[in-house]
Each structure stands twice: as C-alpha cells, then as structure tokens.
C-alpha cells in the first residue's frame, strides 16, 4: 500500500498542475522559444541577417535593419506549413518500437506583412535619415499531428486511473461534490464515465480493463488491449513590431523595436483502448435489487483539450556597422517579454460495453486560469562579407538564457515562500539553461533581377539535468516532484549539471526576383528537423500480474520523429 500511496500522491500532484493549466518549465520554454519566419528572403537565408538588414523580415532579428534600406517598403508574405511526423509504439520501455506511422498536416500561414517609411534629413553626413516601420513577423508555428497504435497486456489507462484514485472516498468522485474536494477533474471524469469503479470494502478501485482475482486480493489486465494515442497542436505566435531606425553616414545604423507578441496555442491529446478479445474482460455489475449482470468491456477513450491565449510586450535594440567596404557587423539584444496568458481546458471520457446500458460518458467543466510569464532575454551577433552587389555570406550567433523565466500570479500577495509558482520557478532556474543558435546564409545575384539563396541553422536545447548529493540523475520533473519534501529542506541538493545533446536543425533555400520598377518577389522554403521525442500517454503505476506478484505496470512509450516544412512567397513594392 505504501507504494500505491506514493503513486497516488504523484498522480494527484501532476493532475493538480493540469487543473490550473499547464505552467511548468517545458511550457515556459515552448512559449518563449522563437523560430523566426519573416519574409521569404530571410527564411531562405536561414535568418542569418543580423549584419545584413534592409529586408522587412530582418527587423525582428535586428531592429537596425530598417535603417539600412533607403526606400519605403510595403510587403506581404503568405505561406504554407506542412508538419510531417512519424510515430511508433512500444508496449514497455524505450525499446521494441513497432512500425512507424507517418502523418502530415498542411496549414495556411501568414509569416510576415508590414510597411516602412523613410524620412531624409537632407544631410550628407551624420544623421542622414529616419525609418519608421510597422511589421508583423511570425516567430512560432504550432502545427503538429501524431498518431500511434499498438497492443499490450501489461497496463492500461483505465487501470492507471484506478491506481491514482486509491484511498479516495468514493463519495468524493460523484455528483457536484467534485467541485469542492480538490481532486483533479481527469480522475473524476474517468470515474463518472465508468472507466473504473470500486470493489470490496474501503477505497479500493479497479479499472474496467482489469479482472479481479477470485480471492479479491488483487487485479490485473487479463488480455491484450489495442491502444491508440493521438496528439495534435495548432496555432501560431506573432510579433507586431513598432520600429524606429536611424542611419548615420551610411556607416552606422541603429534601431529600436517595441514588440507586442500575441499567440494562440492549442493542444489536444486523445487515448483509446479496446479489448482484442472482449470475452477476456468480463464485468459483473451488482444491481440495487441484489441481482448481478455480466457484460464485457469493449472500449474506452479519454481526451483533454487545452487552449492558451497570450499577449505581451518587450523591447529590442540593435546596431549594424560597416567599418570598411565588404565587412558588416551587427548586434542586438532583446529584453525579457512579459506575457499575460489565459488558459482553458476540459477533459472528456467514454466507456463502451457489450451491454450498451452500462456504457457511459462524462465531460468535466471547462477550466480557466490566467497568470503572467516573464520570458528570457536574448542577444544575437552577426558578421557578413559582401562581394560588391553580387553576393554575400552571413553568419549569426544567438544566445538565449531560459533560466530567467518566471511565472507570476496576476494578483500576488503574501511572502515569497507562499508564491504558488515558487517551486516551478526554482525548477526553471536550475533546469532551464542557455540555448545557442548558429545560423549561416548566402546570396548570389545571377543577374540584376534574379538571385539564389541558401541557409543552414542549428540550435541547442536549453534543458539540462543534474546529479544530486545522493548520486541520482535528476530531471526537471524529478526535482519538482520532490522539491518540498527533499530539496527545500536540504535533505537533497543539486551538485552538477549537464545539458542534453538535442539539436534542432534547419536547411533553407530560395530565389528572388526584382523588377526594374518597384515590384519584387521572393520564394523561400525551410525544412526544420526536430529531435526525436518519447511520450508517455499515462503514468507508470504499481499493480499485479495474474499470479498476484507485484509488478510495475509501465505505460507504453510513443516515439515521435518530427519535421516541419515552411514555404513562403513574399510580394512587395519599394518606392
């Protein structure tokens, strides 16, 4: 029972986090991360434009880029985003994955639009011109769909819910009392749909995917279950930028942005399981009149849907210097952004039996929660070499310090130790570190009106793990789960950290056309390859096998391999 109680506490802790939305380190990184899109030209150059400037898509990377162009601009960039994900299923552990199922999903996008105006001072030296701009650049696309299938007789999601509910009084899971008892709505929705129920005396629960031993001493999964896990994401993040630039003698260019990022991020997760042989999953219901009815478990499903709407503000300053012909140097620094985020979420569950009279479904109320998030600061540096007006090569380096991410209540009060985000922010401080991003781009002008472009980028993960004083390897989830009981009291402390070796890589290419008049058009494509990820659709839990031996009922693992294609067409006018 001790092990079950520990599991129950962990499950309830994780569920409580879900009840108040999704405020953990990984969510903060997801919101904070910028993957610049912009115009088709900057995308084709791998966004290695810190020292180049001129293009409207570069202003979000280096505000000084607006001062480089000595003409007004009006541009719009429609595009398409194609998510390609391969998913495979393993019934236990991170080995033995089955066949990979591939899925792609296409969405229309608008990576960029905007306009700039140049005002000349009439001077030939010193401050020659001012530039004002209003631009929208896309900085993230949440386009993702993954689906995996497999069979297992080792565990089930319905049984995991039953294990998580162990020790809870059944009256707390029914009716309107669920509003006030502090139990997570995922457990309540699963119970009210019939995914698990009580048996024997006391607060003992069993999943409808399990069989109870004749002695009533233990329960287990009696046969194979066909399982199906689906995850999808949608939405985008965009920065509306108010830009101001200054040109000093065509040698030094300075710019400042006030950015207003806004985003919608949607996440949906669905899990289905069904009996391969229903006769192996008998269910006996005790009716109020004392009689019994036997039926068979057919299938169950559980899903949660989460949507976050965000808006924020930040500032960014930048400079580009041309010390002598051919060489260009650029640098920019962005302040942390302060976001206000409002989340909505809901759980749904269904259960189906051979006798449809006992089938059920349940939906939780829709939850809502608002809070603030401070994102990291970032700094980028660039160097470029131009070969007259025929070609250039550019290299960028960007640094982002995720350890400064902090969640805040909208209306905080009390001592810092009473901050509901104190443990999460400590996790951010220790387990989110510095991410590095290297970008390379080149352009070759074949004729006065036609150019070829290519780029490459590689970015490191900011996530790290530690060794503690006990010699254990500690992840962010481990630290958060044990923070109050061990790390806050000093019984355990972190000793040495290491970064994971994950890399996100991108390859880009494109072409450009410039007419003799004001019209121009660019076409660009980017292929981004993300690190492989392993996903658990439910928690591991303690259970028994058919002989009554204690076992660790492990959740299946889902391996996802993800790539994202983005193709954009910029049309614009210079005047």
PLM regions and their residue ranges:
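Outer-membrane beta-barrel porins/channels
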Residues: 23-37, 42, 118-575
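Outer-membrane beta-barrel translocator/receptor signature
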Residues: 40, 52-61, 67-153, 238
């Amino acid at each position: 029972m001790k092990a079950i109680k520990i599991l129950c506490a962990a499950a309830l802790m994780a569920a409580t986090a879900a009840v108040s939305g999704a405020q953990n380190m990984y969510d903060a990184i997801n919101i904070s991360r910028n993957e610049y899109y912009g115009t088709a030209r900057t995308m084709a150059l791998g966004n290695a434009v810190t020292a180049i400037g001129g293009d409207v898509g570069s202003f979000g990377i280096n505000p000084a880029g607006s001062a480089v162009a000595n003409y007004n601009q009006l541009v719009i960039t429609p595009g398409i985003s194609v998510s390609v994900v391969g998913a495979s299923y393993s019934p236990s552990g991170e080995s033995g994955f089955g066949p990979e199922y591939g899925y792609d999903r296409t969405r229309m996008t608008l990576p960029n639009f905007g306009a700039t105006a140049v005002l000349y001072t009439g001077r030939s030296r010193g401050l020659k011109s001012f530039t004002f701009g209003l631009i929208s650049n896309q900085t993230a696309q949440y386009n993702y769909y993954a689906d995996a299938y497999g069979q297992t007789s080792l565990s089930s999601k319905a049984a995991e819910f039953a294990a998580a509910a162990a020790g809870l009084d059944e009256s707390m899971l029914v009716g309107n009392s669920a509003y006030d008892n502090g139990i997570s709505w995922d457990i309540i929705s699963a119970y009210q749909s019939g995914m698990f129920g009580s048996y024997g005396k006391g607060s003992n629960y069993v999943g409808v995917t399990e069989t109870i031993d004749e002695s009533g001493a233990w329960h287990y999964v009696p046969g194979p279950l066909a399982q199906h896990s689906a995850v999808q994401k949608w939405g985008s993040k965009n920065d509306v930028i108010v830009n101001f630039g200054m040109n000093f003698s065509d040698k030094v260019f300075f710019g400042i942005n006030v950015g207003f990022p806004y985003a919608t991020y949607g996440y949906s997760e669905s899990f289905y399981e069904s009996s391969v042989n229903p006769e192996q999953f008998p269910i006996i219901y005790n009716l109020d009149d004392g009689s019994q009815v036997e039926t068979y478990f057919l299938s169950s499903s559980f899903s949660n849907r989460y949507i976050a709407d965000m808006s924020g503000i930040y500032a960014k300053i930048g400079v580009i210097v041309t010390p002598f012909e051919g060489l260009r140097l650029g640098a920019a620094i962005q302040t942390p952004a302060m976001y206000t985020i409002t989340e909505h979420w809901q759980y749904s569950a269904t259960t189906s039996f051979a006798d449809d009279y006992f089938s059920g479904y349940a939906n939780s109320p829709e939850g809502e929660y608002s809070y603030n998030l401070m994102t990291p600061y970032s700094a980028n540096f660039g160097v470029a070499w131009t070969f007259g007006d025929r070609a250039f090569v550019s290299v960028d380096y960007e640094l982002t310090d995720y350890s400064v991410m902090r969640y805040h209540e909208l209306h905080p009060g009390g001592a810092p130790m009473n901050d509901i985000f104190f443990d999460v922010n400590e996790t951010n401080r220790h387990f989110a570190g510095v991410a590095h991003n290297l970008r390379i781009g080149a352009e070759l002008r074949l004729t006065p009106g036609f150019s070829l472009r290519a780029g490459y980028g590689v970015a490191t993960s900011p996530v790290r793990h530690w060794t503690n004083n006990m010699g254990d390897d500690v992840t962010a989830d481990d630290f958060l789960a044990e923070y109050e009981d061990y790390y806050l009291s000093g019984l355990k402390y972190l000793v040495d950290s290491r970064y994971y070796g994950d890399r996100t890589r991108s390859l880009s290419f494109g072409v450009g056309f410039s007419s003799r008049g004001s019209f121009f058009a660019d076409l660009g494509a980017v292929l981004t390859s993300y690190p492989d990820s392993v996903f658990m659709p439910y928690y591991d839990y303690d259970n028994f096998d058919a002989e009554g031996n204690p076992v660790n009922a492990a959740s299946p693992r889902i391996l996802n391999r993800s790539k994202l294609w983005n193709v954009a067409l910029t049309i614009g006018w210079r005047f």
